[in-house]
Amino acid sequence: MARGDLLRDEEIAAALGRLAGWQQTNGALRRIYEFADFRGAMKFVHRVADLADAAGHHPRIEVKLHRVTLTVTTDADGGLTQRDIDLIRRIDG
């Protein structure tokens, strides 16, 4: 499978079985992270930003006080690709 190829439903289901806390929604994968405070949430966001820059692939990030929601998809390809799974593994690694 080429990096830009959209994942098939069974590939997404298999990946979700190995990605704790992630859910599929509207052609993307989403996870909510909770932290003790805003500072902890922002430290996490900065770490995600570093990983995303290194990968050249960036999630949507929403911060609400101590809660961070990440949404990962490959907009250019119109859905989920291996790049998304790879980024999630780096974030959760």
Which sequence ranges carry the predicted segments?
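Alpha-helical scaffold segments that form or flank carboxylate-/histidine-based iron centers
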Residues: R31-R39, V68-D75
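Short arginine-rich
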Residues: G21-Q24, A49-P59
